[in-house]
Amino acid sequence: MNFMVMERRLFTFCFLAVVVWQSVALAAGTSSFTALTASLDEAIEAHRHYVAVREGRIARLKCQLLDADTANLSFFRWNGEIYKEYKTYICDSAIHYLRVNLDWAERYGRQDAVLETRLELAHLMASAGMYEEAAELLRQTDKASLPSHLLPDYYNACHKLYTELSFYTLDDSFKKHYQALATHYDDSLMQVLLPSSSLYLERREAREAAAGHPDEALSINDTRLAHAKPNTPEYALVTYQRSLLYRRLGNREEEKRYLALSALTDIRLSITDHASLWN
């Protein structure tokens, strides 16, 4: 990525963080809010340090990749580690490294790796608005041939694609069609997930919220939050979703608190797929 694009992303990132900071500051009045706004302010000031930390990890992984034999499984694994670093940081780079892994798996006949990587790429592309590309990858996937452990990935990718399509289409007929497909794949997903899994709990929470039961959704979020370690992507996601539940409940103070916690985590981890900052 060129310097100007990176600078623009950093500017947008910091601008949105300041907006969140100001919103939280307006809601402040307790010592906990004061401490939180101070932490957010410090993180905004230090954002370039956090970016440098992530870039350092990526650089070290790329050095490992250079030393790997392209015919060896280690090449696939190092590519996968680089993809994970880019996933919530720079989407087009994440797509590139997943595509490299998909090509590698196809070239060397690693069918399990082909299927797993294809589904991961389909989900990522659907998240990035590359709907036709995601749909094509899913069309290339024969559900009947999938091992059972990949069925959740398949249904989750399909659910993601049709949820995104239903949200962005301007045609009411297509919206209803996509919503029906999203519901179908969500039902299928819930049937193959372990009830104790993080994705199962996330989907249950979303269902309760969509059904107009924010208190029940918040109870599920309590469980998720208890298991989410601070300063992790999971914590950023759970706190953001918690802020949305408090909004539904009309609790603006708690909404802003958890929105700020999510934004703070995003900044510290250099997560630029920052839903909390766009809210």
Regions found by a protein language model. Give the residues of each.
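Bacterial N-terminal signal peptides
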Residues: 13-22
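Bacterial N-terminal signal peptides that target proteins for export
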Residues: 3-13
